[in-house]
């Protein structure tokens, strides 16, 4: 049972992968995946060793054919000769026979339910009678059980790895593109594992959409509990991208689950060198797990809240905050910031700027300001903020919107009476608890349970230097992920006791909102990290496409190394660029292929031309 308000690890069955354990009482493991050709032993070993030296505890390699699967023996032998015992994981798609071979040489084999025995997707609805559907499940069992027997004989672990982008037409036809369909795709395999008493199983459910990823994993946890299954989970956001956006997107999804105690191993998938993923994953794990043993947070879940299928908490709109409005962003001016000279990104200007005890002399046209209540004079576009101990003064100040800072544990009768009497008040939820998520959740559920519809802005305070900006971004994204996906967030206010620029804090807040699918402020790139299947220069291609499309706010562009997830993830993108073979690229509009096998040297130009022409038609 998940405790919304207090951090503790979910109890998962122990699984042995080579010399390390996943689940049970083992720490959360971090891993990455090579991008080299799996037939190139020297290149794979060199890259695997870089991953291991960075702190990676498992290394995954693509094994698209029998040759690649057999070469795992050579890669494994060379790593052992070099003194490394790190387990290798074979990544198998489209060919169940390859999984049989890989199980002989890898410590773990990942199979994808979407393409293990089901034919390649053509995105067509197929009508099955119940009897025909049962026959398909029998075919799956007949093929999967021999593989499990090989794994049992060789002490090889199995990962059932479902990707939102590669669901089979069979699952899509019966369940649609839904969390229920994704979960059922996994459960079909788990039921066979349980029937065969094969317990050396790890599960993953991934998507590039953080909301789908988190909600689907929550549903899977619920379904497994109902079936008395306790397999460990591997977490990741597929095609997260690169740079700050990729890190923030990963932290929103992975962090939301880790914060609820879910996850036994993680991978942060970045379109960068694989060893660059490890420090990011390690920081996320360390940041969340240090909450263990925190002071108990007393909280009661609101009766209308659903952890598995959350909807936005009902609130009354105050100005542009709450109701059906997108969440707002509030920025604080630092001691050395001049309100008139601070420059914000034009598409990421804060909705409100907090100025402390005095307003700037020359204010920006149309900009809204927040000022301490005892300095508030009622000037246009200015709003007062009250600390929780100034609740008695709220009624004496006239303003269309007022802000009240609250923390769980404040005298509830006093603040509830104030909020009931003053619906114009926006709550600013703060916490200095080690488990700030639990405390901020508990406060918001308390409001909800007592019929209070005041919007809630979550204020998060950090202490980082400018050199640690990436750490702040990961922590803020992890802290806000669950609050946003739970439907509790009406605004974000990031503050920092350090020299990180206010513009960087504001940009981070907007990036977190976009990663959680709550507010769009820039072009979004759904790009995979690449693997041995990728046959073009992924990183330079991403850079070219970004340079040409960064101004296209609101557009989602998929950049995928191969067809494993490519066409499926295109359903979540407006346009796509997908590897189609050596030196060849196919272009997509959503999941419809519009140009096939374009020479790589011409493909970016073709994509940009197609986007331009298509947008003109609209």
Question: For each predicted feature, which ranges?
Answer:
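N-terminal amphipathic alpha-helix/helix-capping segment at the start of soluble metabolic enzymes
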Residues: 1-32, 148-154, 290-339, 547
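Extended, intrinsically disordered, low-complexity segments
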Residues: 2, 282-332, 356, 370-395, ...
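Active-site beta->alpha loop and helix N-cap motifs at the rims of alpha/beta catalytic domains
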Residues: 3, 56-188, 319-320, 328-438
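Conserved, mostly hydrophobic/aromatic
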Residues: 30, 91, 160, 203, ...
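Short, acidic/polar
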Residues: 38-50, 94-99, 250-254, 337-345, ...
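A structural motif
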Residues: 53-58, 106, 198, 262-263, ...
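Glycine-rich phosphate-binding active-site loops on the catalytic face of alpha/beta enzymes
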Residues: 57-60, 106-122, 259-275, 482, ...
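Catalytic alpha/beta core domains of metabolic enzymes, predominantly
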Residues: 127-144, 149, 171-321, 401, ...
């Amino acid at each position: 049972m998940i405790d919304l308000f207090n951090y503790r690890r979910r109890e998962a069955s122990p699984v042995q992968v080579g010399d390390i354990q996943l689940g049970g009482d083992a720490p959360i493991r971090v891993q990455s995946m090579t991008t080299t050709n799996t037939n190139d032993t020297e290149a794979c070993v060199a890259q695997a060793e870089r991953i291991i030296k960075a702190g990676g505890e498992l290394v995954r390699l693509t094994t698209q054919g029998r040759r690649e699967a057999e070469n795992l023996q050579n890669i494994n032998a060379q790593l052992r000769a070099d003194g490394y015992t790190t387990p290798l994981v074979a990544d198998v798609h489209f060919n169940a026979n390859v999984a049989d071979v890989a199980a002989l040489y890898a410590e773990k084999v990942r199979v994808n339910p979407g393409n293990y025995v089901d034919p390649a997707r053509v995105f067509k609805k197929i009508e099955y009678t119940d009897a025909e559907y049962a026959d398909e499940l029998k075919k799956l069992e007949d093929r999967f059980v021999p593989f499990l027997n090989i794994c049992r004989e060789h002490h090889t672990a199995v990962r059932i790895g479902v990707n939102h982008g590669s669901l089979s037409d069979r699952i899509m036809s019966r369940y649609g593109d839904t969390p229920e369909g994704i979960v059922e795709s996994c459960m079909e395999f788990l039921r066979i594992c349980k029937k065969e008493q094969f317990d050396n199983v790890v599960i993953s459910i991934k998507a590039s959409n953080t909301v789908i990823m988190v909600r689907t994993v929550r549903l899977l946890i619920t379904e497994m509990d109902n079936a008395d299954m306790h397999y460990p989970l591997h977490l990741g956001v597929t095609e997260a991208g690169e740079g700050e956006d990729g890190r923030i997107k990963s932290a929103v999804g992975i962090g939301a689950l880790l914060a609820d105690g879910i996850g036994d191993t993680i991978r942060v998938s970045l379109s960068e060198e694989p060893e660059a993923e490890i420090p990011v994953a390690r920081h996320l794990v360390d940041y969340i797990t240090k909450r263990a043993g925190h002071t108990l947070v007393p909280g009661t879940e609101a009766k209308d809240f659903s952890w598995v299928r959350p909807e936005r908490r009902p609130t009354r709109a105050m100005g542009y905050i709450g109701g059906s409005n997108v969440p707002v962003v509030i920025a604080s001016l630092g001691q050395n910031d001049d309100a008139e000279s601070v420059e914000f990104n034009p598409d990421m200007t804060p909705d409100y700027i907090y100025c402390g005890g005095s307003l700037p002399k020359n204010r920006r046209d149309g900009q809204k300001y927040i000022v301490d209540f005892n300095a508030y004079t009622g000037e246009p576009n200015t709003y007062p903020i009250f600390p929780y101990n100034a609740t008695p003064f709220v009624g004496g100040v006239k303003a269309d919107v007022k802000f009240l800072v609250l923390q769980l544990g404040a005298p509830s009768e006093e603040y509830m009476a104030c909020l009931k009497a003053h619906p114009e008040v926006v709550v600013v939820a703060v916490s200095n608890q080690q488990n700030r998520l639990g405390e901020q959740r508990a406060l918001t559920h308390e409001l909800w349970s007592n019929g209070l519809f005041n919007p809630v802005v979550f204020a998060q305070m950090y202490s980082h230097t400018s050199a640690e900006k990436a750490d702040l971004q990961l922590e803020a994204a992890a802290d806000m992920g669950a609050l946003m996906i739970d439907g509790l967030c009406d605004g974000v206010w990031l503050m920092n006791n350090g020299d990180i620029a206010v513009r960087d804090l504001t940009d981070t807040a907007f990036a977190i909102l976009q990663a959680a699918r709550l507010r769009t402020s820039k072009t979004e790139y759904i790009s995979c990290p690449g693997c041995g299947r990728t046959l073009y220069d992924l990183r330079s291609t991403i850079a070219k496409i970004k340079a040409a499309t960064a101004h296209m706010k609101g557009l989602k562009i998929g950049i995928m190394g191969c067809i494993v997830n490519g066409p499926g993830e295109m359903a979540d993108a407006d346009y796509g660029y997908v590897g189609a073979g050596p030196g060849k690229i196919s272009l997509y509009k959503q999941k419809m292929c519009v140009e096939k096998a374009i020479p790589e040297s011409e493909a970016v130009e073709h994509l940009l031309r197609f986007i331009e022409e298509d947008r003109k038609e609209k």
